[in-house]
Structure formats: C-alpha cells, structure tokens
C-alpha cells in the first residue's frame, strides 16, 4: 500500500477527496491544498490517469528537521536514492519554502541535488544528470519552518496539462480548475451545455471529456514515473488500455451537444484545435459571436446549462463595459433561456449582481492568487406578460425623465455638454454628465457608515441602467469616484491616455479629456458665466486668473476682447488653454498665457484690465503656492489686489464653490467696491437642482 499526496487548488480539496475515493483510494485525509491518501500500485496509476482535479500526485519519501544546511543535506541523503532511479535517469529538484537557515530556494535545491548525486558517487555508481526542462524524475522538497518534506512527483508536468492545449496559449483557468467548475455547475451530462465567452474552450472541453468518460491523462506524452525504478509498466499499460476503451465507448454513445462562442476569432480557432486534439471536436460547435448575439440554440428544448468564466477587470475604466456585459447576459438569460440553468465563475461577485438573478448555490475557490466565487442560478420560464426588471428602476426612471427634458433644451441652446443627473435621488448618489456622445458617471464617495459591498453593487446597477437608458456603447461611459470637491482635488491626475474630445459650447470649440483627470477640463456649471463674459468682453482687455484650461478666455476672445491674459500655476493646463485658443483661431500676441502662482502674480502685476474673471479654489496649500489660501478668509485681500488692476469702469466676475460663502460687503465698501450677486442668473436648467454648486458675483467700483 503506497502513501500518496494529491495537491489541488485551494477550495477544491473536498471535491478531490470524493474523486479519489471513487477511484478506490483509502484513508483519505483533507489538508489545505490537497489530500493524503493510500492505494496500491494500480491506484497510483489510476489517480494519475483519471484525476481531473489533482494538480500533482506525490509519493512522499520522508521528512527531516532542518536547523542547518548540513541537516538538509544529510536528511536527503538518508533516502535510498540508488533504488529510486533507473540507470541513466535524469532528474530535477523543485524546492519551495524558506527558514532561518535556508533563505534561498535555489540554494536549497542545490543542497538537495548535491545530496542525491553524492548518494550515487559514494557507492561508485554513475552520477545522474540534472535536466531542468524534461527530467525523468522530479524531486519535490517543501520546507515549512524546521521540517523538510521530500517526495517524488509522479506527475512530471502538472496534471492540468492534459496534452490538448498548446503550452504557449494563455488560459485564464487551468484545466483542473475548469473540471471543478464543470462538476459544481449543476450541469448533467447528456443535456446541452453552452459557453458564450468560451475563449480557448477549456470549460467545454473538460465537460465533454467528463461526459464521454475520457480520462484527462489519456493524451499526455510524459510522466514523472518514467525514470522511477519501481514503475510497473505492465500495470500502467493495463490502466492506459482501459482508459482508451472507455473513451471510445463513451464518445460513440454520447448523444448531446456542446456550444461555444467568443467575439475573438483567433481564440475560437484555438478552441477548435484544442477540442480536436482532445478527441471530442465533433461534439462541440464553436462560433465567432458576441454575447449580444447570444441566442438559445434549442428554443424548443431540451433545457440545458449556460456555463462560463466571464472577464473581470481590476482597472476602473474597464468596469462600465463589464457591468454592461453582465447586465446584458442577465437580460438574455431571462428572455431566451427560461428553464435553463446558469453557472458563472468570477473573481468579482459584484459583477455577478448585475445579472439581476438570485443564486441557488455558490462555491468559493482560488484561481491562482485570486479569490473567486462560482454562482449557480435557475432561470425561471418567462410568461407572456412577464417584463424583465431593470436594475435601479427608480434611478432609471428619473434619468429617462431628465433625458427627455434636457436633450431638447441642450440642442436648442447649442451645447453638447450638460448634466443629466445630480444625486436627484439620495440613494443613487452620482452625477451623470453628457459630453457629446460620451457620458461621465461620477460617484460621490459613500460615507464610511455605508457598507462598501452594497455601495459597489448599487454603483454597478447605476452603470447598467445608465447604459440602457441612454443607449450608449459601454466604451463610451467613463466612471470616476470622487469626494465632494476639496481644494486642489480637481488637479489630481488619474491616467495617461491623453485622449481629447472636441466639444462645442455655444459658439466655442473646446477640448475635454474624460479619463486622465478627476475633472474633464470644462466646469459645466460655469457655462452661463462664460457666455456672459463673452457678451461683456467686446473691445476690452480681459484677465483670467486661476484659469484652468482657459475656456472662459476662449469665450472672451470670441466675444471680441482686445486682448486676453490667462494665468495658472499648472503648465499642463496652460498648454491645454493654448490648444483651446488655437482651436478657435485665437492666436498671436493679443493672447498671453502666463504660468505663475496666481496670488503672487497678482501682488506684483501692475497692468490694467477692463474685465477680470477669477474662480479661485475654496482652499489651497499647494507646495508651489507661497501661502495657504482660504477663499472665505482671504477674499477681501484678493479684491484689494484686483482693484489695483481694474481699469476705471471695469468689472470683476468673482466665483467660487464654497458652500455657504458670505461676501464681506462692508469690507468691500471700505475698499471702494460694491458687489452684485448673480448666482441665480448663472445657473442653467441642468444645475437648477443644485443651487449651491457655486456662487457668482459682479464687482465694480462703488
């Protein structure tokens, strides 16, 4: 009776134990990452040939305590290696784990290799050669704290390498994990199975091999026992012959079918090749098809199972497309696959919530370093009067209502960029802005009292509903998460795409960047203020302080300003402003751009202007600014400096975003200035719901 160990992916240990017991293994004991078991020589070969779940089958040889590198050397050498190796057999050592003595796995492997080689030379036997790439024998040593466990790896290459997949091909899941996903899916062999995002076909191929009683090891060319002196070739050939007979019989008797599709023609070609090499190509129909084209291949029955490992992303900019994909799949399942089962394996449970289906069962597993979940659903049969529910229905209805109202208004106004939704419903705490045929969804960061998982699920529902209501392509939706504006947050850089979109605002053409920064380069709430500046600027010298991307300067220039001066501390935004000016034909000496700390520049400047626009941050303590600035505390100092630059009869338009800002009218009067609040006049229809988004004033000589 041999003592053996089968390793597997985390989360699959109990499933592997059942599989090994069905093969005839006894004394099975589950540990993290595998199963210890016992069996005769035939069971050794059967576990190698038939286990769909084991990563490797090991033959433990012994353990030793390792307090020094000499302990490791002597512990390994104590094993009778000369009775383990066939003459001329090559070997390789895989060493994992470290302790205070063995701090490098390569060093540990070298000490093991030396001990094995010396075991032969001490008996005056030819020393075995090392072959790291294709050894006849693999020795596995695992060091945990002070104990080293030594074993022969009878698998050779990992058992997930069935022999049907090109090793160069990238697989998101190993074949062993794919087999477990099939087993847990609830699918019954003999019923249809469909994978609408099949990639190279691994799930379908593993299912077809299982259904046709085809051993997963049948197509492997190399094994780890080929150089093992105790290998029994006769028993191995019996096990192999039995597997071949069962495979032929299973294929001949199988009557159901498998269906796979993917939008990538290259991976579909690879899937067809893999299925053919696995010996079950005739059972699977592969098609190049997007999920949006998914249809029930058997509308008249029988019912089957949809099984897939859909894509999931770590990057924020990939989420809208993935949310739309899962939402679409959920709708298609309800519309076309009533009575079927659905099973999805994913590293993102939140994405699975976009299906709008209730899971009957779920399982956890590891896919490499990723924590994953597999959820099984039963899709109820639809009735003639059944209507699929939309995620975030209240939000969708409000967005639909706003769209009807603002789309026509924006067209009449001659603007392409406007706010469609601004946290109208407190439970859907986002802003939705339209930029031509693009949409930006900004999630206001939820309070810490809100469960993060629930908040994320709600955001996914919002995105799915937004895409559906607006009828936009998922790649035209940009998702951002932000807190309510604080100081210089608007300048935070998020990416490096450098993709600019040209939009129109009245008679101005402007560049926006929807992805690289927290803001887009165009503050939509200041749209009317910019138009007013254009109407006030004819024949005047115009100054724009804290200019951002210079959109106000563009309006002033198009309004006929004699000259424009644009000042900002950021070189990036000044270059952006220059591009905006050039886009509108505003070039030459009349249009100056100055990179400077605006407060310092203001104190030193001695020029005169007829019209000044200033939109300072609420608060700023930038390292590049000489002093911290607070708009409530410091606005009178600002006005004093601005008055010095203001030509007789001139006007200052002053705006800021501080909620509850109070203008010091008495202080202004002492400076010889007066202020007229024009906030309500500068709020367009799309911002009428949020009357505190900014405040705006016209300031002139008293």
From Swiss-Prot:
EC number, as in UniProt: 2.1.1.173, 2.1.1.264
Q: Which GO terms describe its molecular function?
A: 23S rRNA (guanine(2445)-N(2))-methyltransferase activity; RNA binding; rRNA (guanine-N7-)-methyltransferase activity
Tell me which GO cellular component terms the UniProt record holds: cytoplasm
Chief place of localization: cytoplasm
Residue ranges of the TM segments: none
Signal peptide extent: none
Where does the record place the THUMP domain?
43-154
The listed locations are: Cytoplasm
Catalysed reactions, semicolon-separated: guanosine(2445) in 23S rRNA + S-adenosyl-L-methionine = N(2)-methylguanosine(2445) in 23S rRNA + S-adenosyl-L-homocysteine + H(+); guanosine(2069) in 23S rRNA + S-adenosyl-L-methionine = N(2)-methylguanosine(2069) in 23S rRNA + S-adenosyl-L-homocysteine + H(+)
Q: What does this protein do?
A: Specifically methylates the guanine in position 2445 (m2G2445) and the guanine in position 2069 (m7G2069) of 23S rRNA.
Which family, according to UniProt? Belongs to the methyltransferase superfamily. RlmKL family.
Give the HAMAP family listed for this entry: 23SrRNA_methyltr_KL (MF_01858)
* Name of this protein: Ribosomal RNA large subunit methyltransferase K/L
Question: What organism, scientifically named, is this protein from?
Answer: Escherichia coli (strain SMS-3-5 / SECEC)
What's the gene?
A: rlmL
């Amino acid at each position: 009776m041999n003592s053996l160990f089968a390793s597997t992916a985390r989360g699959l240990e109990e499933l592997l134990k059942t599989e090994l017991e069905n093969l005839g293994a006894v004394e099975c004991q589950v540990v993290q990452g595998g199963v210890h078991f016992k069996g005769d020589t035939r069971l050794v070969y059967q576990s190698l040939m038939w286990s769909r779940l084991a990563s490797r089958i090991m033959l433990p040889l012994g353990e030793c305590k390792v307090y020094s590198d000499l302990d490791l050397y002597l512990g390994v050498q104590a094993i009778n290696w000369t009775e383990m190796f066939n003459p001329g057999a090559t070997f390789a050592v895989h060493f994992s784990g470290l302790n205070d003595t063995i701090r490098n796995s390569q060093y540990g492997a070298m000490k093991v290799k030396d001990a094995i080689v010396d075991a032969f030379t001490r008996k005056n036997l030819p020393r075995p050669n090392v072959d790291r790439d294709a050894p006849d024998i693999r020795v596995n040593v695992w060091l945990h704290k002070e104990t080293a466990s030594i074993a022969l790896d009878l698998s050779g290459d990992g058992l997930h390498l069935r022999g049907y997949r090109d090793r160069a091909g990238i697989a998101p899941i190993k074949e062993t994990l794919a087999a477990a996903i099939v087993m847990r899916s609830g699918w019954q062999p003999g019923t249809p199975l469909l994978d609408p995002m099949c990639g190279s076909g691994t799930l379908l191929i593993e299912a077809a091999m299982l259904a046709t009683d085809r051993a997963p090891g049948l197509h492997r060319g190399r094994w780890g026992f080929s150089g093992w002196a105790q290998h029994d070739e006769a028993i191995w050939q019996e096990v192999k012959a039995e597997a071949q007979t069962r495979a032929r019989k299973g294929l001949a008797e199988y009557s159901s079918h498998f269906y796979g599709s993917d939008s990538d023609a290259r991976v579909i070609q690879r899937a067809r090749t893999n299925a053919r090499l696995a010996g079950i190509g005739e059972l699977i129909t592969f098609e190049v098809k997007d999920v949006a084209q998914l249809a029930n291949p058997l509308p008249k029955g029988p019912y089957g199972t949809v099984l897939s490992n859909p894509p999931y992303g770590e990057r924020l900019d990939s989420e809208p497309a993935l949310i739309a994909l899962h939402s679409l799949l959920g709708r298609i399942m309800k519309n076309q696959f009533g009575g079927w089962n659905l099973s999805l394996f994913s590293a993102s449970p939140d994405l699975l919530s976009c299906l709008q289906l209730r899971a009957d069962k779920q399982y956890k597993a590891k896919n490499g370093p990723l924590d994953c979940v597999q959820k099984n659903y039963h899709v109820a049969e639809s009735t003639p009067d059944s209507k699929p529910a939309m995620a975030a229905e209240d939000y969708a209805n409000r967005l639909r209502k706003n769209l009807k109202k603002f789309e026509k208004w924006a067209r009449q106004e001659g603007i392409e960029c406007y706010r469609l939704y601004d946290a109208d419903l407190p439970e859907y705490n986002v802003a939705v802005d339209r930029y031509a045929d693009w949409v930006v969804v900004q999630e206001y960061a939820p309070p810490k009292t809100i469960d993060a998982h629930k908040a994320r699920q709600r955001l996914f529902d919002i995105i799915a509903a937004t895409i559906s209501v607006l009828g936009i392509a998922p790649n035209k939706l940009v998702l951002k998460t932000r807190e309510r504006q604080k100081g210089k947050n608007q300048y935070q850089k998020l990416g490096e795409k450098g993709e600019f979109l040209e939009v129109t605002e009245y008679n101005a053409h402007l560049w926006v960047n929807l992805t690289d920064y927290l803001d887009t380069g165009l503050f939509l709430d200041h749209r009317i203020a910019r138009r007013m500046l254009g109407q006030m600027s004819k024949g005047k010298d115009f100054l724009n302080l804290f200019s951002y991307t210079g959109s106000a300067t563009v309006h002033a220039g198009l309004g006929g300003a004699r000259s424009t001066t644009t000042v900002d501390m950021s070189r990036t935004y000044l270059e952006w402003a220059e591009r905006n000016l050039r886009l509108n034909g505003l070039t030459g000496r009349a249009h100056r751009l100055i990179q400077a700390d605006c407060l310092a520049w203001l104190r030193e400047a001695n020029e005169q202007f007829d019209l000044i626009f200033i939109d300072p941050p609420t608060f700023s303590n930038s390292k590049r600014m000489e002093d911290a600035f607070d708009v409530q505390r410091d606005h009178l100092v600002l006005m004093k400096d601005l008055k010095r630059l203001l030509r007789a009869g001139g006007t200052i338009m002053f705006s800021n975003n501080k909620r509850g800002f109070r203008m010091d009218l008495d202080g202004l009067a002492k400076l010889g200035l007066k202020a007229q609040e024009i906030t309500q006049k500068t709020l367009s229809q799309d911002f009428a719901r949020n009357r505190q988004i900014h405040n705006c004033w016209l300031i002139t000589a008293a």
